[in-house]
Amino acid sequence: MIKLNKIKRNCVAAVILTMCLMTAGCARNSTSTTTASGGETTITSGIAKDDTDVTHADDAENYRVAITGDFTVTSDTSDGVTQSGSVYTITKAGEYTVTGLLSEGQLIVDAGDEDEVTIILNGTSITCSSGSPIYVKNASEVKIKSEENTFNEVIDNRTEATEDSSDDAGNAAIYATCDLKLVGKGSLVVTGNYNNGIQSKDDLSIKNVIVKVTAVNNAVKGNDAVDIESGNIIAISAKGDGIKTSNSSLSNKDNQKGIVTITGGNIDVYAACDGIDAAYGVDISGDGNLNIYTDTYSEYSEEVTSSGSSPSTSTGRDSSANKTASANTVSYVAASDTITNAPGGFGGGNMGGGNAPDMSNGNAPDMSNGNAPDMNGSSGGNKTGGDRPGMPGDFNESGNSSGQSYSTKGIKAESEINISGFTINICSTDDGIHANSDSGVLETGEDGKGTIVINSGSITISSGDDGMHADKQLDVNDGYINIVTSYEGLEAMTINLNGGKIYVYATDDGINACTGDGKTSPIVNVTGGYIDVTTASGDTDGIDSNGNYVQTGGFVLVKGGSSSGNVSGSIDVDGTVTITGGT
């Protein structure tokens, strides 16, 4: 029986918005300009980036050529290949070069337990309607190399799998029961009409290759691990996840399984469900570009079967949303306005006048000398209006009512997420980045850690729910974070903001330290960095802690409030506010 990974647990949050919803997405030119007697002021909901600034992966389709000629498998290993009709079987360790057109056939590896096999794709097309076109039944490790300056394709033409389908003939277009490595400087197009695109039951690694994977379910899956070192990868999932691991156990050497590791490359992920779904963790470091579009932000998404009380129920989907969205008008109060008789950030009083620092060039003010930027000065009158982008898909003014009973997050891990590099762009109808701490969720029987750590990198998120959500703890030590749109920008029980530049736009709370396990007292702790928070009209807070707020450094700017002249709490706490440094 086949397990369809597109079946998702119910993970829809019940959220109600009380204002006109903004976009969850990647709109071009979403900086708002308002005009009043005091002149023109630019209010930024984060620093919106033009989509033309996004670096996308090179598409393997750009190198497509017609594959002709007889199919051949050559090797210097004698008696290493057998042929039965259109099925070619590699039985020994060695290097095998594949060329030509194989229609309705298979390339199978069935070697010894200790054998390492290298398959060189040297201009080939393999199509099969009865099993995985490339099927590794047994070996120690298989390396598939796309030869430089060649175009290659693998097409699984089987009818889409069901719950009763067998995986005896392979569960993906390229399917391996052992470690699988994709390498080479050529191009490879993989189409998985049956279930997954590329899958290893152990570790899957990708280096250098230009690869485009389109699958009805998961595009790229390594049960134990996925490791992307370099290359250009486009992963498209019509009904599942883009990049996925599923095993969170420990290896025989006590190494943690279930981690997606990305250290280089240009990667585009289009997924109906999660962009990256890790059974344990996600580690991203180094230089590269990662773009993720989920649910209605992926033009490739189709109807998804959801689990819950009715596992067989199909959830209808609206047409996919364009990455650029239309704008709704939202009223708000500029940070530089003088508000009288309005509740202040700490439980009453006026919001002082002054001018917000100029950030029109997208740069935070210089605080290298330890001093906060000068905000003295007067402002004109109240400023309202301005365009805010509109929500995608089936979001509407009643709240986050997408109706999905499956997860559509950008990056999701059952335990921890660590980011130390990369330029990341996420457009998701669910949380942009999410770490779980569910009880006993790991195969070791342990709870997930529920932690997110940002050490460096540039992250831009447009989310229909939370920008970043950690069940336990969120640490930002450095880097650039731009939550262009969200319901709540940053959310965790413990939020430590130690450095970097952080821009947040939220329709509810910008930064929220929430209750959770009943053991940890929620806290927002600011020790450094530049934090710019904008919230929409209504009952919203720039910073909301269900426990305490502590600031010993950094610069915090909160903009938000109401078109009627009232502003919600800049900082709203259930505990205490302690400020001994910073601004």
Task: Give each language-model segment a name.
Residues I2, R9-T583:
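A composition-driven surface/loop motif
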